[in-house]
């Protein structure tokens, strides 16, 4: 059981979740795009949210700036979060268009706001769970897409909510976070997504 729960730490790693969100979006809205557009956007997301952050991690570790694999120390989170924020900004500014892919545009804008908020909290001496931030933002994005396209993803949403609990349990089991840090990470992930609903989702309902 412990191995099963701990697996969710890796399945829903913060670097992987934006790729899951992109895949989910194009599974729902693929008929509105050409295949080459889907491949191009997915490739850009994969490079900027997984490959480059992993490369930076190994660079910082080789330079002695990072010691642990899971960034338990608050100071170790500063550079990765700042770098990830820049990559998200590049992705938003050059890969998406608010007129062409508004749903993904606002999802990643929400992720950027959450990442900057997590960085601000670290600078203020507080730590939030990046895992909970990622999975909660994805869950809210799924709810938004369900409402926007009038498609009932009740089972998927229920599964994601259950996964939120399993991710939280895995982080507690690993003694990586306190309950307060998990709750803070969840709020940091949820609030920007809900706030941006007022821009792209609610006007269309």
Q: Where in this protein do the model-derived segments appear?
A:
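The first (N-terminal) embedded transmembrane alpha-helix
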Residues: 8-29
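Alpha-helical transmembrane segments
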Residues: 37-52
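Membrane-water interface of transmembrane alpha-helices
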Residues: 51-64
């Amino acid at each position: 059981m412990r191995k099963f729960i701990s697996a969710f730490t890796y399945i829903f790693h913060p670097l992987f979740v934006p790729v899951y969100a992109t895949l989910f979006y194009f599974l729902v809205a693929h008929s509105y795009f050409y295949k080459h557009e889907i491949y191009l956007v997915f490739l850009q997301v994969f490079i900027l949210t997984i490959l480059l952050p992993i490369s930076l991690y190994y660079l910082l570790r080789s330079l002695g700036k990072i010691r642990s694999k899971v960034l338990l120390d608050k100071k170790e989170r500063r550079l990765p979060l700042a770098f990830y924020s820049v990559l998200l900004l590049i992705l938003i500014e050059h890969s998406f268009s608010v007129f062409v892919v508004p749903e993904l545009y606002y999802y990643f804008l929400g992720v950027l706001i959450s990442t900057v908020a997590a960085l601000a909290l670290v600078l203020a001496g507080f730590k939030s769970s990046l895992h909970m931030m990622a999975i909660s933002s994805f869950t809210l994005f799924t709810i938004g897409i369900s409402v926007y396209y009038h498609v009932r993803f009740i089972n998927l949403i229920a599964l994601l909510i259950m996964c939120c609990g399993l991710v939280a349990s895995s982080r507690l089991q690993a003694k990586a976070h306190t309950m307060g840090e998990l709750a803070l990470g969840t709020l940091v992930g949820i609030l920007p997504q809900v706030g941006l609903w007022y821009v792209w989702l609610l006007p269309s309902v």
